[in-house]
Amino acid sequence: MGDDVHRFGNLFLISPSSNSILSNYSPADKKKFYVETERAESPKQAIMMSYKEWGPDGQGINNIESHEHAMLTLLKEHRDMTLPTRK
């Protein structure tokens, strides 16, 4: 996957215990684990796991780039929101 493994679109936070359990799993096996256990540790992870193809080639890399763009757009929109002031 090269440098694409470090893209924001390919990253999500997981607990230290999950990281320990899955540290030696391939990306495909990690996805299989989360899909089979119907477990997601964050909304971003759930979205990532919903893609059929995810990886370094073809549609997989296109999906990583698309997800990254969508997440960055969402963060920018949230940042630009005007929040009401508290009294």
Curated annotation (Swiss-Prot):
The lineage of its organism: Bacteria, Pseudomonadati, Pseudomonadota, Gammaproteobacteria, Enterobacterales. InterPro entries: GmrSD_C. This is Uncharacterized protein YfjM.
